[in-house]
């Protein structure tokens, strides 16, 4: 029998317990500090706690920051603040429109605003009174606002009122965060699926369909000089009637189409070329940005640019020459052997936004849309 009795306590385990209790106390104090340091009204971190402060809606023209916005839902919820031009459209599944894209929940129901991961704001629908027509200024944390316009800067009012509100841009400009052109060319996946051009169906020479007739505009002045040397059939208000549903049938009778833009801005190449001319198999005669700008999206022999001629009279002479020389005229269609034109749709544009939001969680602020969109 051991005369010394029970062994004495081992003190090292008490020191370990004290160390663990101290670390636990430090952790509790740290997280309590973070909790009370948050803004009770918005849930947004106060300045100084994070390197980046997410935008809460108040304009800040001097800030452009990055952070990580974690979607609040497994499927992204995208709110259309208004339907484009107040006209509802069908919204198919994005996975069916864009290969490899997961579906987003896209809706125009404004009641989901507090839960939306992103809000798309169509400029035309809010531009006359941005202060009253924009979404609520205090947004949910991490929610991204997307500025969307297919109109040119000449027809976008009050851009300066939007400084600091938006996180992404979406437009026909190729340097937009979300590029949504009016049209594009893509390669045929197999043999071209269209019949050869039937020249015998091209019974007329030059057409122009115009709805926004401004006598002092550059395009109307050029037309007036051109028609002094060449017959041009003009359709639209105060001109030849063009009943709804007959546009392509009518324009397809013409060899050339005046794809004259209503204003001149970088990348502003609209349905006047992609739909009115190319879908009608008419050679587009373009007035808009520079030839080099057009050639970023089209082969150089797919169109005729007014800048290639010293005067409208010279252009008229050239079109008359092509009218008589079938081989030269048909050379403007060679690109169709390998490429086909495609046109935009609202649904496809919204699915491009869906894809962008899935691919990039970076949170930024657009300092000035007015300074960029020129």
Swiss-Prot record:
EC number assigned by the record: 2.4.1.152, 2.4.1.65
Keyword Transmembrane in record: yes
Transmembrane annotation, as ranges: 16-34
One annotated GO biological process: ceramide metabolic process
Coiled-coil region(s): none
One GO cellular component term: Golgi cisterna membrane
Pathway note: Protein modification; protein glycosylation
Protein name stated in the entry: 4-galactosyl-N-acetylglucosaminide 3-alpha-L-fucosyltransferase FUT5
Glycosylation sites: 60, 105, 167, 198
The protein's role, per its UniProt record: Catalyzes preferentially the transfer of L-fucose, from a guanosine diphosphate-beta-L-fucose, to the N-acetyl-beta-D-glucosamine (GlcNAc) of an N-acetyllactosamine unit (type 2 chain) of an oligosaccharide, or a glycoprotein- and a glycolipid-linked N-acetyllactosamine unit via an alpha (1,3) linkage and participates in the surface expression of VIM-2, Lewis X/SSEA-1 and sialyl Lewis X antigens. Preferentially transfers fucose to the GlcNAc of an internal N-acetyllactosamine unit of a poly-N-acetyllactosamine chain acceptor substrate.
Keyword line: Glycoprotein, Glycosyltransferase, Golgi apparatus, Lipid metabolism, Membrane, Signal-anchor, Transferase, Transmembrane, Transmembrane helix
Annotated catalysed reactions: a beta-D-galactosyl-(1->3)-N-acetyl-beta-D-glucosaminyl derivative + GDP-beta-L-fucose = a beta-D-galactosyl-(1->3)-[alpha-L-fucosyl-(1->4)]-N-acetyl-beta-D-glucosaminyl derivative + GDP + H(+); an N-acetyl-alpha-neuraminyl-(2->3)-beta-D-galactosyl-(1->4)-N-acetyl-beta-D-glucosaminyl derivative + GDP-beta-L-fucose = an alpha-Neu5Ac-(2->3)-beta-D-Gal-(1->4)-[alpha-L-Fuc-(1->3)]-beta-D-GlcNAc derivative + GDP + H(+); an alpha-Neu5Ac-(2->3)-beta-D-Gal-(1->4)-beta-D-GlcNAc-(1->3)-beta-D-Gal-(1->4)-[alpha-L-Fuc-(1->3)]-beta-D-GlcNAc derivative + GDP-beta-L-fucose = an alpha-Neu5Ac-(2->3)-beta-D-Gal-(1->4)-[alpha-L-Fuc-(1->3)]-beta-D-GlcNAc-(1->3)-beta-D-Gal-(1->4)-[alpha-L-Fuc-(1->3)]-beta-D-GlcNAc derivative + GDP + H(+); a beta-D-galactosyl-(1->4)-N-acetyl-beta-D-glucosaminyl derivative + GDP-beta-L-fucose = a beta-D-galactosyl-(1->4)-[alpha-L-fucosyl-(1->3)]-N-acetyl-beta-D-glucosaminyl derivative + GDP + H(+)
GO molecular function: 3-galactosyl-N-acetylglucosaminide 4-alpha-L-fucosyltransferase activity; 4-galactosyl-N-acetylglucosaminide 3-alpha-L-fucosyltransferase activity
Predominant cellular place of this UniProt entry's protein: Golgi
Origin superkingdom: Eukaryota
Recorded family membership: Belongs to the glycosyltransferase 10 family.
Topology relative to the membrane: Single-pass type II membrane protein
Lineage: Eukaryota, Metazoa, Chordata, Craniata, Vertebrata
Cytoplasmic compartment spans: 1-15
Compartments where found: Golgi apparatus, Golgi stack membrane
Lumenal-facing ranges: 35-374
């Amino acid at each position: 029998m051991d005369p010394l009795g029970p062994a004495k306590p081992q003190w090292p385990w008490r020191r370990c317990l004290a160390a663990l209790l101290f670390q636990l106390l430090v952790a509790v104090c740290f997280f309590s500090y973070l909790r009370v340091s948050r803004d009770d009204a918005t849930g947004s971190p106060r300045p100084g706690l994070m390197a980046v402060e997410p935008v809460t809606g108040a304009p800040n023209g001097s800030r452009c920051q990055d952070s990580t916005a974690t979607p609040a839902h497994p499927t992204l919820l995208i709110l259309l603040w208004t339907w484009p031009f107040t006209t509802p459209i069908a919204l198919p599944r994005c996975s069916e429109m864009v290969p490899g894209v997961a579906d987003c929940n896209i809706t125009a129901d404004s009641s989901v605003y507090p839960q939306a991961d992103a809000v798309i704001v169509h400029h035309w629908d809010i531009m006359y009174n941005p202060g009253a027509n924009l979404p609520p200024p205090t947004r949910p944390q991490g929610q991204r606002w997307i500025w969307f316009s297919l109109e040119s800067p000449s027809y976008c009012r009050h851009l300066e009122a939007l400084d600091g509100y938006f996180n992404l841009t979406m437009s026909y400009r190729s340097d937009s965060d979300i590029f949504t052109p009016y049209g594009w060319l893509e390669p045929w996946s197999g043999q071209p699926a269209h019949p050869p051009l039937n020249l015998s169906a091209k019974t007329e020479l030059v057409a122009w369909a115009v709805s926004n007739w401004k006598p002092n505009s550059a395009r109307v002045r050029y037309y007036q000089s051109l028609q002094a040397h060449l017959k041009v059939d003009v359709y639209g208000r105060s001109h030849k009637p063009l009943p709804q549903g007959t546009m392509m049938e009518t324009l397809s009778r013409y060899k050339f189409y005046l794809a004259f833009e209503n204003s001149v801005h970088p990348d502003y190449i609209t349905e006047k070329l992609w739909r009115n001319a190319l879908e009608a198999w008419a050679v587009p005669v373009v007035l808009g940005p520079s030839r080099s700008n057009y050639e970023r999206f089209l082969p150089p022999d797919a169109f005729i640019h007014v800048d290639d001629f010293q005067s409208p009279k010279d252009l008229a002479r050239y079109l008359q020459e092509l009218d008589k020389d079938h081989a030269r005229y048909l050379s403007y269609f060679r690109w169709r052997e390998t490429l086909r034109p495609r046109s935009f749709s609202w649904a496809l544009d919204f699915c491009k936004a869906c894809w962008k939001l899935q691919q990039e969680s970076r949170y930024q602020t657009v300092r000035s849309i007015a300074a960029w969109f020129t």
